[in-house]
Amino acid sequence: MVKAVAVLGSSEGVKGTIYFVQEGDGPTTVTGSITGLKPGLHGFHVHALGDTTNGCMSTGPHFNPAGKEHGAPEDENRHAGDLGNATAGEDGIVTVSVVDSQIPLSGPNSIIGRAVVVHADPDDLGKGGHELSKTTGNAGGRVACGIIGLQG
């Protein structure tokens, strides 16, 4: 079993901890919570780079080793890092629970050392017809991020 964690933070008061667990070659289970968000949907993605030297802006694009278009988590044609939306309640808290087979914690496409990013707006899952739909899901600014690191 491989475990990883990302501690999310931002200058906007959004924070959280996201845990990743993978058994063998099975799917990765993502759990955790995020606080300080405005109520509603927020794009939730794994980005390609674990670089936060310029805040969340330096985490690069969505993790996309297969060179596909942006999509929903259940779509065949999607970035590996497309995890859909996280829903914040009226209290601004998100409880994350995702199981996904495209974000392994080991092997050539491992997400260890990359970043998880929470966006300001809903991810349209590539179906919004906006010029950014097929690249970012038109999910808006990056309100919090954290580098995914191995956990003991």
UniProtKB/Swiss-Prot annotation:
Top-tier EC class: oxidoreductase
Compositionally biased intervals (Basic and acidic residues): 67-81
Claim: Cytoplasm is one of the keywords in the record: yes
Substrates-to-products reaction catalysed: 2 superoxide + 2 H(+) = H2O2 + O2
Gene Ontology CC annotation, any one: cytoplasm
Gene Ontology MF terms: copper ion binding; superoxide dismutase activity
List of residues binding Zn(2+): 62, 70, 79, 82
Record-linked Gene3D superfamilies: Superoxide dismutase, copper/zinc binding domain (2.60.40.200)
Domain of life of the organism encoding this protein: Eukaryota
Cofactor note: Binds 1 copper ion per subunit.
Stated pH dependence: Active between pH 5 and 10.
Compartment(s): Cytoplasm
Thermal activity characteristics from the UniProt entry: Active between 10 and 60 degrees Celsius.
Annotated keywords: Antioxidant, Copper, Cytoplasm, Metal-binding, Oxidoreductase, Zinc
Region Disordered, residue ranges: 61-87
Catalytic activity, EC: 1.15.1.1
Transmembrane recorded as keyword: no
Role description: Destroys radicals which are normally produced within the cells and which are toxic to biological systems.
Family: Belongs to the Cu-Zn superoxide dismutase family.
UniProt subunit comment: Homodimer.
Name of protein: Superoxide dismutase [Cu-Zn]
Organism: Zingiber officinale
